Amino acid sequence: VMAGQQLEKRTDWKIPLRGFFYESSRKKRILAYYHQSQEHLMAEGLSMLLTDAPTHPDAPLWKASCEAYADYLRGISQLIEPYGILPSAVYEVDNTDYKNLYHEGEQVGLPSLEEYNAQVRNGIPLSKDFYLRRFPVAYQFRGFHAIVMGKAKAAFILARLFNDKALRDIATRQVEYIL
């Protein structure tokens, strides 16, 4: 899990971020959910390891990973004002993969790369090719509550782990927005 995480700040971006995860340890594509989300699982697993084995030789690495993701949540938490909701994810122009995308019927078809890029570029620019999207890139599905809740759950988990009121407030704001 940690091998697929951006632990250092991306100082080449307009908003230097760190802590987000990639789809794999090869770090070719940043992890982004478009309809459902399991984004909390990395924080949950690492938090459980820290709680259950705080003296393990790898515990400092687990903690550093959790701290990096907490920094990511804090860093993106003020970007959608006045709502205070967390943006969906960082997307890269020309970098998507549709092979595992389920779609309803042949008449719908898959989105084109041009459609994908247009949506990506409608995000908050980080650099020429990277954008932070307020909402997920919409293929066929719409809505983003599951994505917001995945991030909220991760923020609650890390708030408990670090006894961090700011993270707890970020998580609470996500639930308030949905309710």
What are these regions (language model features)?
Residues 1-179:
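Glycan-recognition and catalytic cores of secretory/periplasmic carbohydrate-active enzymes
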